[in-house]
């Protein structure tokens, strides 16, 4: 089983990492190619392209200038400890043991506009480049064209080492990021967990809660050493419960009703 997550725009390079082990990202050459293109942009170009404020554009202009193809603990941090958004608050990697992170290294992957596909302990230099950004590059009009089937092929290499029911991809990424994966070319079925909260008289996906729940699901997989998808149906963190009637073989629906 492999579970894929989206990255986070918010990053934490202030908190010291609680583990020393790290690995190198697989797609450094590809990232270098993107950085070369990004370095041609002015801060104003970046602000327009990414629809961000001028201060944030200047910050990322400097990040691209500082970026190095050599990753060390001095200029980088393990990806799952550097990302700091809603998903990663749910995953809470800083409270996982070294053994937990070792299991995560085998079973969790993060999709990235700049880095393609990351393992939890892959070193990460700070950046901003969302997968949906229409950044024209040497391979096409956007990042989906740039990555093509590279991410899918990398996932297949890892999925093909799994056997039986454990050869499955659990999609806990956003639609924007999962578009970088080509399910028809995957060597495994895809199961997408969906998290719904009761609001306004019906169950609906509430973005903030759903993002956090995806991180909680990844943590559940890691802490419980889950290898087969049926075991995911027992997930019940923070009030969510599996709804068999609303689910099917490719979509697992979890619902939560807190008050009225």
Curated annotation (Swiss-Prot):
Query: What InterPro entries is this protein classified in?
Result: YaaA
Query: According to the lineage, what is the superkingdom?
Result: Bacteria
Q: Which GO terms describe its cellular component?
A: cytosol
| Example GO biological process | response to hydroperoxide
Family, per the entry? Belongs to the UPF0246 family.
Q: Which PANTHER family match?
A: PEROXIDE STRESS RESISTANCE PROTEIN YAAA, PEROXIDE STRESS RESPONSE PROTEIN YAAA
- Cited HAMAP family: UPF0246 (MF_00652)
Q: What is this protein called?
A: UPF0246 protein Bmul_1054/BMULJ_02209
Q: Which organism is it from?
A: Burkholderia multivorans (strain ATCC 17616 / 249)
């Amino acid at each position: 089983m492999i579970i894929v997550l989206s990255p986070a725009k918010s990053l934490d390079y202030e908190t010291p990492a609680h583990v020393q082990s790290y690995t190198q990202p697989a797609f450094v050459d590809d990232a270098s190619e993107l950085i070369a293109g990004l370095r041609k942009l002015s801060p104003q170009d970046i602000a327009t392209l990414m629809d961000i404020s001028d201060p944030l554009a200047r910050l990322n202009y400097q990040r691209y200038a500082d970026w190095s193809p050599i990753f060390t603990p001095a200029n980088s941090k393990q990806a799952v400890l550097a990302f700091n958004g809603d998903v990663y608050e749910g995953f809470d990697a800083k409270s996982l043991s070294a053994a937990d992170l070792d299991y995560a290294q085998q079973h969790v992957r993060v999709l990235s506009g700049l880095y393609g596909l990351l393992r939890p302990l892959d070193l990460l230099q700070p950046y901003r480049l969302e997968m949906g950004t229409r950044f024209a590059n040497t391979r096409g009009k956007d990042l989906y064209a740039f990555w093509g089937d590279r991410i899918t092929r990398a996932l297949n290499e890892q999925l093909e080492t799994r056997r039986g029911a454990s050869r499955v991809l659990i999609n806990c990424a956003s639609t924007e990021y999962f578009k970088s994966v080509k399910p028809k070319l995957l060597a495994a079925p895809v199961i997408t967990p969906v998290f719904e909260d009761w609001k306004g008289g019906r169950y609906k996906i509430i973005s903030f809660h759903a993002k956090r729940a995806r991180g909680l699901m990844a943590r559940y997989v890691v802490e419980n050493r889950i290898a087969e998808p049926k075991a995911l149906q027992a997930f019940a963190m923070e009030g969510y419960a599996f709804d068999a009637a609303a689910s099917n073989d490719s979509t697992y629906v979890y619902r939560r009703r807190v008050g009225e």
